[in-house]
Amino acid sequence: MREKKDALVVTFAETTQAMAVETYCHANGLPGRIIPVPRAVTAGCGLAWKAAPADETALTAAFLMAGLDWENMVVLKI
């Protein structure tokens, strides 16, 4: 079985928010990728953004500057 590692998981209330974050991050070279929401988290839509926990500050600042919305940001072992 694969060893679980800490990951920053960003959840969204709506799928359109997740898609906007994915588009913005890819266009601006920000780290992470879209994943299905882990079972340990509840979210409005079934998609989440996964990145390294060390990227939390940079992603939060970028999302705020771009006016992107998210529901929750947590660090989980996944």
Regions found by a protein language model. Name each.
Residues R2-T11:
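Short glycine-/aliphatic-rich beta-strand segments at the starts of folded cytosolic domains
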Residues E14-R33:
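Short amphipathic alpha-helix segments
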